Amino acid sequence: MIGLADCNNFYCSCERVFRPDLTGKPVVVLSNNDGCVIARSEEAKALGYKMGDPFYQVKEKMEAEGVAIFSSNYTLYGSLSNRVMSMLSHYSPRIDQYSIDESFFEADESMAKVFFREHAEDHPTLFNKMTIDELSEKPDSLLHRYGSKISADVLRAVGIPISVGIAETKTLAKIGSKFAKKYKGFQGCCLIDTDERRHKALSLFPIEDVWGIGRQIARKLDYMGIRTAAQFADKKESWVRSHFNITTLRTWKELNGESCISIEELPQKKSICTSRSFADEGITDKNVIEEAVANFAVRCTEKLRRQGSVCQGITVFAWTSRFNEHVPEYTIHDSLTLPIATNAQEEIVGAALSILRAKYPKPMADSRPDRSDMSFHFKKAGVILWQISPDHPRQQDLFDPIDRSKQKKLMEAIDAINRKNGYGTIRQAIQGTDCRFDLKREYMSKQFTTNIHDILKVKTR
């Protein structure tokens, strides 16, 4: 069996962890530069706010209705996500993190039985005076309680509510988690372990919400009169093969209980990107753009080292807004290949800056007398690392002028200090100190778990 743990309204739940006064109140989280709504609590959904609502259009309404508004705090969200995933690893030996707020895990009765035997003395109320063997004889008791226990423990330990779905396939597990989230009667876990339960769940589930069914496929199925997952699952395999591709066929098989997507370890990324859109009118100062690109390159190298990889390809891009008719348009997009694969930030930052400087536009003079010096307003920039390979073993070069052993120790020391004291404690001079390219985040919460200056203070008597 496969389980899926899905954090409920994750970004909003993260903001509530350190703000218990927001429990039961509407909460929304905004996108980069406070552009639009990207997360809503159940209370905010009930007030009619939609995903993607432009903030400037709903700001006054939110303030009038007492909605708690937050800018995106990805440092906090990432930290709490790591805590949730760490908790899940105590319940299953195989974890497959799908996103920041979702993770698949291996789940079966033997695993649940072992867990409960080890913790029976600590949790006697879980069994209601029944033995574990007696629970195992009931068709759903053990696995359902196992999933409910995971949900309750994560909420108690981390403060994040999660919904658990357990089924024979990943697709069915995702459907189960949706039901667990929607209906409180499931007590945090929906178990789909029989054909009867599977068909009942599929008959209530819209086809457009099935994992793996995109908008175009959903429209095609709707045109064919198929509006629920059950109607699609009941079709013959030959019919599915004749109308759809192999990906949709795999989804059909998963809906019918045939596992086609197994639990896997998190695969190594084929490319790593860090980018950002800039607030207001954008950036016109070349020095600020260089600071931004340097910081993006450093972020990429941190991710690279974290997954134990090196890279040989680097791409830098930056562009102006296409929608501002009063300033000139310009696009930077270029790449280079390093002679030796590396994950050292001084090498990658240097290469990224060389790309930017080579392609940066020269000062231009406009022909109009009222605009003798027009500048470029860059609205977005980023760095991409590619040709990624494992750090061990790494291809060596007989004539490499760099002491790689010494360089590796330096990177390990920098990473350790920055992990302990916060991002940017040790940085290259080109990164700057005041983050002149930072996002517009007027509703930013504190970094309660990663910045020692933001740790909550508790008064004792």
Segments from the language model and where they lie:
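Short intrinsically disordered coil segments
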Residues: 120-125, 331-334, 397-403
